[in-house]
C-alpha cells in the first residue's frame, strides 16, 4: 500500500499508464455544518477521478500484513502506525496517496494530523450526539490526545473507527516529535472551539462565511504550513505567514461549498451566506427553481468571484515552497479548485446536479501540477475560461473582471522570477509515486474483497 510513497525504489511509469482506471465520486451524508478537511476532500475527489478505491471498511488487522509495504518500511513501522495508515486509506480514500507521497517524518505527522481532525470532524457530524454532550466534547477534544485510553464508541458515523480506536491514533500522536504535537494539539483546540460556536449558528454575512471557512479549512492550512516548517523541509516563513495559509484553506472550502449547493440544500444544510443569496431569493433553496435561474446564476457568480480573491495569495504561497513533495501536496488541490470554479461559473448545472471535473482533466492536472510554471499556466487557462463567460449584465461583472486582472498581474509578476526549488526527485517520478500509492490501495482493496468472498464461500 505504501510502496510508492514510503520508499524511493525505482518502478516503471508505463505500468501506471496501463493500469490507470477512472470512476465517478460518491455522495456524502447529511450533517450540519459541512465536514472539515475541505482541501483534502476537494483534491481527493479529483484524485478519485484518477483512481477510485471502492472497499468496505474492514478491521485494521485485515490489511496488516499487506505485501504492498516495502520491506524496509514494514520493519520500521510499529503495528499502531501501520493501523493509522490503514485508517488513513479508509477515511480519506484515494487522496491518502498524496499524503503518503510526502517526504520523511512529515508523512507520519500529516497522517496523524489528518486522523485527529477526522475524529474531531466525526464528532461534529454525528447528529445523534446531543448538543449538551457534543459541545464540551468539541471544546475539550485536544485534551483527549494525552489520555491513553480515551475513545468514543457511541458514534454511528461512517468514519467511527477513528473514534472507536482513538487510543491507537493518540498513541502515535504522542510518539511524534514535540514540535509536531504542539501544532496538532493547538489546531485541534482552535478548530473544536470554532465548530462548537457554529453548531447552532448559520452563516449570515460574508464576514461570517470567511470566519466559518477559517475554522473548518483555514486552520487546516495553517496547521499544515506549520508542520511543513517544523519538518525543516520548508522555510520558517511558510509556517509563520498565517494569512497566506488561511487563504489556501478558504479557497478550497469556498469551492466545495459553491459546488455542493444542490446536495447540501437537499439534505437540509445551508452554507451559502445569507448576505449573498438574500439579494436574489427569499429562501436559499428557491435558487434551484427553474424560474429563478437568472437570479441563481447571479448569486453563484458573486460567490465564485469572492472565492477567486484568494488566488493571488495561493500563487504567493506556492511560489515559496522548496520541497517537491510538499509542493505537489499543496498544488494539486488548488489547481483542482480553480478548474472546478471555472466549470461552475455561470453554469446552471450547479442547481440541477453535480458539476465535476472530467476524468481525463483530473489526471492531467495531477500529473502536470508539479512546478510553478505549470501551475501558472493552469491558473491562467482557467481564469481566461471564466473571463470568457462573464456576462455583460452580471451584477458582479466589475468585481469579477477586477479580480481576474489581479490574478493575471500576479501570475505575470511571479513568472518573471521563479525561485529555485530543490528537487529531491523528478516531478514525473513523484507524480507516479502518488499514482502508485493510489493504485496499490485499489489493487489491495480488490484482492482483499476477493479473499473475503472466498472465505465467506468456504464458511457456508
How would you describe each model-predicted region?
Residues 114-117, 334-345:
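Short, amphipathic alpha-helical segments that act as regulatory/interfacial helices
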Residues 443-460:
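Membrane-proximal, acidic/low-complexity disordered segments on the non-cytosolic side
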Residues 2-12, 16-315, 319, 381-389, ...:
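Acidic catalytic motifs of isoprenoid enzymes
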Residues 347-400:
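ATP/Mg2+ or Mg2+-diphosphate-binding catalytic cores
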Residues 411-425:
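Membrane-interface, cytosolic juxtamembrane amphipathic helix immediately N-terminal to a transmembrane helix
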Residues 324-338:
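Amphipathic alpha-helical protein-interaction segments enriched in hydrophobic
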Residues 308, 312-319, 342-349, 367, ...:
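Hydrophobic alpha-helix feature that most strongly marks membrane-spanning transmembrane helices
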Residues 404-411:
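Long, compositionally biased intrinsically disordered regions
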Amino acid at each position: 500500500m505504501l510502496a510508492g510513497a514510503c520508499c524511493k525504489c525505482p518502478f516503471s511509469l508505463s505500468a501506471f499508464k496501463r493500469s490507470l482506471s477512472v470512476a465517478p465520486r460518491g455522495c456524502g451524508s447529511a450533517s450540519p455544518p459541512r465536514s472539515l478537511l475541505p482541501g483534502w476532500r476537494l483534491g481527493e475527489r479529483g484524485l478519485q477521478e484518477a483512481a477510485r478505491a471502492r472497499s468496505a471498511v474492514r478491521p485494521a488487522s485485515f490489511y496488516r500484513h499487506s505485501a504492498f509495504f516495502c520491506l524496509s518500511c514494514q520493519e520500521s513501522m510499529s503495528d499502531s502506525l501501520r493501523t493509522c495508515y490503514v485508517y488513513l486509506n479508509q477515511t480519506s480514500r484515494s487522496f491518502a496517496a498524496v499524503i503518503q507521497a510526502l517526504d520523511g517524518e512529515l508523512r507520519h505527522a500529516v497522517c496523524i494530523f489528518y486522523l485527529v481532525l477526522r475524529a474531531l470532524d466525526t464528532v461534529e457530524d454525528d447528529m445523534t450526539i446531543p448538543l449538551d454532550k457534543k459541545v464540551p466534547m468539541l471544546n475539550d477534544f485536544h485534551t483527549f490526545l494525552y489520555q491513553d485510553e480515551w475513545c468514543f464508541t457511541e458514534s454511528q458515523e461512517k468514519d467511527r473507527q477513528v473514534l472507536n480506536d482513538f487510543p491507537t491514533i493518540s498513541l502515535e500522536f504522542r510518539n511524534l516529535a514535540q514540535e509536531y504535537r504542539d501544532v496538532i494539539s493547538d489546531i485541534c483546540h482552535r478548530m473544536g472551539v470554532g465548530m462548537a460556536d457554529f453548531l447552532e449558528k448559520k452563516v449570515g454575512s460574508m464576514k461570517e462565511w470567511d470566519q466559518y471557512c477559517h475554522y473548518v479549512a483555514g486552520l487546516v492550512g495553517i496547521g499544515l504550513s506549520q508542520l511543513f516548517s517544523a519538518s525543516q523541509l520548508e522555510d520558517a516563513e511558510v509556517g509563520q505567514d498565517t494569512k497566506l495559509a488561511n487563504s489556501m484553506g478558504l479557497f478550497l472550502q469556498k469551492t466545495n461549498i459553491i459546488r455542493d449547493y444542490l446536495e447540501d440544500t437537499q439534505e437540509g444544510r445551508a452554507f451559502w451566506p445569507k448576505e449573498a443569496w438574500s439579494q436574489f431569493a427569499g429562501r436559499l433553496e428557491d435558487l434551484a427553481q427553474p424560474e429563478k435561474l437568472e437570479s441563481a446564476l447571479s448569486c453563484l457568480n458573486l460567490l465564485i468571484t469572492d472565492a477567486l480573491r484568494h488566488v493571488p495569495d495561493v500563487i504567493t504561497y506556492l511560489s515559496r515552497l522548496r520541497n517537491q513533495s510538499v509542493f505537489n501536496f499543496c498544488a494539486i488541490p488548488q489547481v483542482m479548485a480553480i478548474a472546478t470554479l471555472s466549470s461552475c461559473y455561470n453554469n446552471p448545472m450547479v442547481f440541477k446536479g453535480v458539476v465535476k471535473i472530467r476524468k481525463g482533466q483530473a489526471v492531467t492536472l495531477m500529473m502536470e501540477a508539479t512546478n510553478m510554471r505549470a501551475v501558472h499556466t493552469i491558473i491562467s487557462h482557467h481564469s481566461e475560461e471564466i473571463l470568457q463567460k462573464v456576462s455583460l449584465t452580471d451584477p458582479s461583472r466589475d468585481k469579477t473582471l477586477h479580480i481576474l486582472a489581479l490574478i493575471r498581474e500576479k501570475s505575470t509578476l511571479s513568472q518573471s522570477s521563479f525561485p529555485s526549488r530543490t528537487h529531491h526527485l523528478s516531478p514525473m517520478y513523484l507524480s507516479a509515486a502518488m499514482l502508485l500509492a493510489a493504485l496499490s490501495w485499489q489493487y489491495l482493496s480488490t484482492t482483499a474483497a476477493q479473499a473475503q468472498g472466498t472465505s465467506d464461500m468456504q464458511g457456508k
